[in-house]
């Protein structure tokens, strides 16, 4: 859901986002030696930064400022690389002392609260589909067995999409009119101090979210991915 919705809200290309999400996930599994069952998608956490640097203009992408927002996200990626090197050099325990659960927990909660208005706004468009998604996720998360318990979000998306299709809420004409093969739009990044300072610090929040996600995945699979393959690899 986020992988599609984030580019729509920011004015980026959905197809390019899906391509980069796939390539990023493959690179992630290469770096983690295929040990961590995770998919890398878009992050809602950067929406605030994007909105501040490149707000939509009458529902259309801000083509003038969007390259600066992309430049800020690029710099946020550099923060990930620096933190990975610090964790590798000083060890997980030394670095994690500065990020105890009392710090990481509220940050993750804050990110969730930031996303709440967007979720409610989307639910208002069709409460039936929204309730089907929520009910499916809750049912499989609580009573699911084996693999079904691990992928409740995917099952919720599949169930709600099926219901939406049966209700005629999905317009397939746009997909039918598109070509099967095409090149992604090429856009060069631009860098500005204000856009970098606005977006780059968000990387600290998403890193806390990442640590929580890796810990949650480890709890589900009963493995310690912080130790093996190591937090710096993830």
Which residues fall in each region the model found?
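Hydrophobic, membrane-embedded alpha-helices of multi-pass small-molecule transporters
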Residues: 1, 129-133, 151-152, 167, ...
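Membrane-embedded helical hairpins/re-entrant loop segments and their flanking transmembrane helices
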Residues: 11-29, 201-234
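Hydrophobic alpha-helical segments embedded in the membrane of multi-pass proteins
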Residues: 1, 16-26, 43-47, 78, ...
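Juxtamembrane interface elements at the cytosolic ends of transmembrane helices
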Residues: 1-4, 135-140, 151, 163, ...
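Membrane-embedded alpha-helical modules
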Residues: 65-174
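N-terminal signal-anchor module of multipass membrane proteins
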Residues: 1-37, 45-63
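Juxtamembrane helix-boundary/capping and inter-helix hinge elements in multi-pass membrane proteins
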Residues: 9-12, 34, 53-64, 88, ...
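Short, non-helical or kinked segments that cap or interrupt transmembrane helices
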Residues: 12-18, 34-47, 95-104, 148-155
